[in-house]
Amino acid sequence: MKIGCYLKRLRTVFRQVANQSATAELHFLALGKLLSENSKNKRQIDSLSDVEFKVFSQWGDDGIIQWLVNHIDFPNKTFMEFGVSHYREATTRFLLMNNNWSGFVMDGSAANVEKITNSEYYTNYELIAKAAFIDADNVNSLLLSSNFEKEVGILHIDLDGNDYWIWRKIEVVSPIVVILEYNSVFGIDRPITVPYDKTFDRTNAHFSNLYFGASLSALHQLSAEKGYSFIGCTSSGNNAYFVRNDKLNDVVKKTSLENGYVVSKFREGRDRNGNLTFLTGPERLEAIKGLPVYNINTDQIEKL
């Protein structure tokens, strides 16, 4: 009897917490809507950090995306995002819920995707979630499975690994805005990326967790070849924004690699035992010095 009473009280507590969480989410959405309306007036900015705010994004991407939505014409209100985890803290979730865009998201974990498909917003909004480990061979077929039109509004690639190689291979969609994660530890002096490995895993590749992805200069060069202009980075120094050249205007403008580059301050490095080392600045590059990288200009494997 006592156990039954305890379980009943526990269920009541869980419901109260869930209700409080839902209420807090509504408040965040309302505040985000106000901030989005305010961004309509921001026609001249010095950097993307001027328009940043976060509701569901990990950093200031929610604000940047709303600013872009307010100042670029998007005929198709669709987005695609790779590497979304459980989607609670995601770059496109506010766009889904505030602007009612349609989305296609993928993650390598079936458990994460199950959490997404069991969520309330999966019922209330037009979102497709697929469990898949994305590589250069399957990315185009996976994108086609969304049944979206070729011109997609926003594409975000955040795979902590083969990001450069995946973006290079994509040809079945033509996004207006592309958000690419870059590794600022690699600097911008060399257009480099980790060599392609279909099974690349950031932690397995090197215990430090610092050896992954591509330099901003590599992504900048590839995007230019694909017809995109660089407009800046998040103030956190992890995501770079590119806009298709035909969509640039007197508000959304191209900037130089040097002007838009932001160095991250993340202290996420680890030792061989998996403990955080809190390495900062040049110490992070020193921890992975000598590891192989592919230079996209020389078509050669070099050392960091």
Residue ranges and their predicted role:
Residues 2-39:
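N-terminal auxiliary segments of SAM/dcSAM-dependent transferases
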Residues 49-157, 184-187, 269-271, 275:
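SAM cofactor-binding core of SAM-dependent methyltransferases
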Residues 81, 105, 156, 177-181, ...:
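A structural signal for short, well-ordered beta-strand segments and their strand-loop junctions
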Residues 98-99, 173-174, 226:
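Short, structured coil segments at secondary-structure junctions
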Residues 116, 143, 166-170, 242:
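Hydrophobic packing residues within well-ordered alpha-helices of enzyme cores
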Residues 156-166:
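Active-site glycine- and acidic-residue-rich loops that bind
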